[in-house]
Amino acid sequence: MSITAPGIYEMDDATYHADPVEAGSLSSSGARTILKSPALYQWERQHPVYKDVYDVGHAVHAKVLGVGLDTVEIPADTLAANGATSTKAAKDFIAQARAEGKVPLKADVIAEINTMAESVLSHPLARALLERPGQSEASLFAPDPETGVWLRARIDRLPDAHPAGRTIAVDLKTGRSADPAEFKRSAADYGYDLQAEWYQAVLRQVRDDDDTAFVFIVVESTAPHLVSVIELGGTFPQIGRDRMRRAIDTFHHCRETGEWPGYDPVVHYVEPPRYYEIQNEEPAA
């Protein structure tokens, strides 16, 4: 598959991440990496590595959304006496499953994933957002109006366009905490503000729809698997748009010049963070 026109497409996860745009495209995760360092972005693009830390997230997505990578149970008789996947039989099974595009997990992890999915679908607002007519794992592609750089986005749940309603795109996340007060720190740490603005910008282009919103459905990875629905507000949207613009411009410049720099080649003078100073203050007499 080769993408040459803006639009919303159906494709599997592997095709999307392989980048089907002939001229190359930039995703929101790539944008967040390029803001750290263009050199890091270029290295990761040329040396992709699958991280099994994402296995649970992929499995929960597939269970809730009904699309995605298939989950397969690692046979109990291949495990070590302590339940570890350190035996040759277990390693061979895992390698074969990954080669087939599946997510290999132990039975207890699969049971936990099923419970997480049930928690999401038992949440009235989360369920309502996910059950609207639409497309799961929708792949969107459109060029940036300012630079011509192709942008791509993969939205977990994209509702069908409705002339009388607002388009609320959904991203499903698993994490340590779904507490909204803690999620705002995660949003800042992991660049979810950029992700939200990125997805909406691409969506507005392919649908010509200015009335969009983006929410996160967050489910905790430990029991009782609490769920919350969160929309980023305050200055998050503007910060996200600013970071998005900077990432696209940086990508465009690097591609035009063929230079993907790392950190500036100077001596970097750093001062201790405030928390470290407080930890080491002399106690009051």
For the regions a language model picked out, list residue spans one by one.
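Metal-dependent nuclease catalytic cores that hydrolyze phosphodiester bonds in DNA/RNA
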Residues: 1-152, 265
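Metal-dependent nuclease catalytic regions and adjoining charged, substrate-binding loops involved
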Residues: 6, 186-193, 198-285
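Short histidine-centered catalytic/ligand-binding loop motif
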Residues: 46-49, 98-105, 180-191, 233-235
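Coil-to-beta-strand transition motifs
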Residues: 148-152, 164-167, 222-225
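Conserved catalytic cores of phosphodiester-cleaving nucleases, focusing on short active-site segments
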Residues: 153-185
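A residue-level signal for conserved active-site and pocket-lining positions in enzyme catalytic cores
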Residues: 61, 157, 244
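Short acidic (Asp/Glu) and glycine-rich catalytic loops that position anionic groups and cofactors
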Residues: 38-41, 174-179, 222-228
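Secondary-structure boundary elements
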Residues: 123-132, 159-168, 204-212
